[in-house]
Amino acid sequence: MGEYIVTKTLNNNVVVCTNNDQEVILIGKGIGFNKKEGMTLNDQTITIEKIYKLESEQQKAHYKSLVEIADDNVLQVIIDSLNFISNTAMNVDSKQLVVSLTDHIIFAYKRLKQNQVISNPFVMETMQLYSDAYHIAKQVIDQLNAALDVHFPEDEIGFIALHIASNTEDLSMHEMTLINNVIKKGIDIIESDLVTTVDKESLQYQRFIRHVQFLIRRLRRKEYIHAQDDFVSMIKNHYPICYNTAYKILTMIQKQFDVNISESEIIYLTLHIHHFEERINQS
């Protein structure tokens, strides 16, 4: 039997307690109703939906401040969303996600009510790179829309997908945003050099962004690939425009991530860009 001493009631659904000298946050419907500091709760008489042990004092303070500015209905919907993500996403760490996602949804909801929408320029890149997280995020947004009687734009699906993906991938939110930005700029360079519009539903696009994502990961781990000299010469001579485009994109990646770029990397990216060129010639 787990016993918890109430140290603070944040609202009807959230209380801060101590358990064996460890401060925890208990979440459950009505769990905080009429609960006062010093009261003892036990898991045999109350329904606990989630127990969060936030590691740092900064996390604890931030979460408490968020809960205090959100009404109970919004907070319950966020709790339901966290439970859904925890039960659906693979390898998700709830205690890491609880603060960031609570923060994001509270302020996204406030902005929406004030008709302030932040555009997300990386929706397509996020959908392609993190398709599982994007699918889960779409279901979360559908649930939020229904429960709060609002209509979050598709931009928010992308934002929430990044929160989920950053929790399950070996990348931070900042790193994923950088990768999305590099991919978007890379596509801009391709469209300019090849005088075309890239079909973001195409297999060529999907292969390109996957290649760039894994290329950046490899380079940051200092894992390099090597192509034979005659193969390098052949590709440079056969596809000079695509080679030049690949060089521009990899130079941008080199500056953005402070990594070393080899001739072989340029060659393999050239081949991916050539697939776009082939599609243009076929149309």
Swiss-Prot record:
InterPro entries named among the record's database cross-references: BglG_antiterminators, CAT_RNA-bd_dom, CAT_RNA-bd_dom_sf, PRD, PRD_sf, Transcrpt_antitermin_CS
Organism superkingdom: Bacteria
Keyword Repeat among record annotations: yes
Residue ranges occupied by any PRD domain in the UniProt entry: 69-173, 174-283
One Pfam assignment: CAT_RBD
SUPFAM superfamilies: PTS-regulatory domain, PRD, SacY-like RNA-binding domain
Any one Gene Ontology molecular-function term assigned to this protein's record: RNA binding
Stated family: Belongs to the transcriptional antiterminator BglG family. GlcT subfamily.
Name of the protein: Protein GlcT
